[in-house]
Amino acid sequence: MASHSAVIESTISQSEDEWIRQSGGFYACPTCKHDLEPSNDGLSCSVCARIYPILGGIPDFLGGNFAGSGNRSIRVVGNWDSGILFDFMASVYETCIYPAVCNLYGGWHSASLKQLAHDVSDILESRGGLILDVACGPGTYGRRIASASRTVIGIDICLSMMHQGARYVQREHIPNVHFARAMVEELPFRSGLFDAAICAGSLNHFTDVVLALREINRTMKAGAPLAVMCFALIDSGLMKYKSIRDRAERGGGHIYSVADLERRVIEAGFEDFRPHAYGSVLVFSARKGPEEH
């Protein structure tokens, strides 16, 4: 007799497979950007002949070549993903790890996850439609902003986190949150698709922030809002100490000043940069500029 967890996993996989096949037009080949079609093997590109499998209800656009990646995060996560360690981390990420990190870097000025999610939701205003959640983890923010009028599609490189997120979605009865495994630098979506985008907690780990933001920008509609939570060099909070910033850099992170972030955001095609700090935790908004003709 199948265990309760096995039944849940099967239900998640079946419902997501059905949604992927019915959603049509959302996904595009991350390599050649042409539309993908559902097939018996997953999602197929008729132009470059690539096939992307669907693993437990989650399309996998990343593949298995982790060792040769120039992205340190992909090498680390890819080689350890779906092991006992990452499965455990995924199960406690939202209740223990994430709040601890925000409290540590926020210091006396730290904001709760509830407050940060509220800030992100405010940036999106009352906008509905499709929302892109970049480096979504277990849908920490996406699940909190999803609604009857908002469908959230989260991308991450860690399958364990997204499988945990799919379990949360099932348990919390949130029908409008979906996941895909992909890199921010090569998003598997057609251009001008999303009504808004969010990225909470991972901007500091992107190898090339401008490249990542440009790719996010590509997938958004003109005038669409962007909401980001990251860590920054600010006069309050732990990041004001050089030793802490150096340690973050050695671990693959990049700590920017608010001015540096604004410059990169504008360079990537956004405008109207507006920051708000909680210690070294920064929430900022921006908006995609008008389409060039």
Model regions: which residues?
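Short alpha-helix
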Residues: 253-268
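A short glycine-rich, Lys/Arg-flanked "PGG" loop and its adjoining helix->strand segment in the class I
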Residues: 210-222
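A short acidic, Gly/Pro-enriched loop at the edge of an enzyme's catalytic core
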Residues: 185-196
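Conserved class I S-adenosyl-L-methionine
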Residues: 25, 56, 62-126, 140-144, 225-250, ...
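A short SAM/SAH-binding and catalytic strip from SAM-dependent methyltransferases
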Residues: 196-208
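N-terminal auxiliary segments of SAM/dcSAM-dependent transferases
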Residues: 2-84
